[in-house]
Amino acid sequence: MQVKMKLAAMLLALASAAPAFAQNPSPLVGAWRMTKFEVASEGKLRPVPYSGQLVVTEAGTLSAQAMNPDPNAAPTPYTANGYEALYGSIVINDSTNTFVTTVQSALVRNLIGQKMERAFKVSGNRMVLSPIDPSEGWQVTYERYQK
């Protein structure tokens, strides 16, 4: 009986300490509104009139949407008719400020199954996202949605 009581007391103590062991979510987790999209041109990043949002969940998912207001925008590896939409799982490494998304569905179906590694920097309610490979030549700035 004493062994059961000690075991129950230990389990109760461990259960009450569980929140102390819980990890804080990454600063990347949340809903973000695109404020600037820049593409490399002649060696410099230049703004392109895009709008969009990025949603990263604690459950380990990412969804992204972005739109060029030009209905005649040329397709890119990520867009069709000026629109980008994708969803997938995400693994975040806060110590290196990087993440990898494995695309599970996308408007541009060639993206499905691809792993995309990205760098991010969060400062307050602002986040800058860029490719790991600078030759991809783009950068996106987001602002966290507020209640």
Residue ranges of model-derived segments:
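Bacterial N-terminal signal peptides
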Residues: 8-17
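Short helix-onset patch at the extreme N-terminus, typifying the N->h transition
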Residues: 7-8, 27
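Lipid interaction determinants
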Residues: 21-147
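Positively charged n-region of N-terminal signal peptides that target proteins for export
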Residues: 1-7
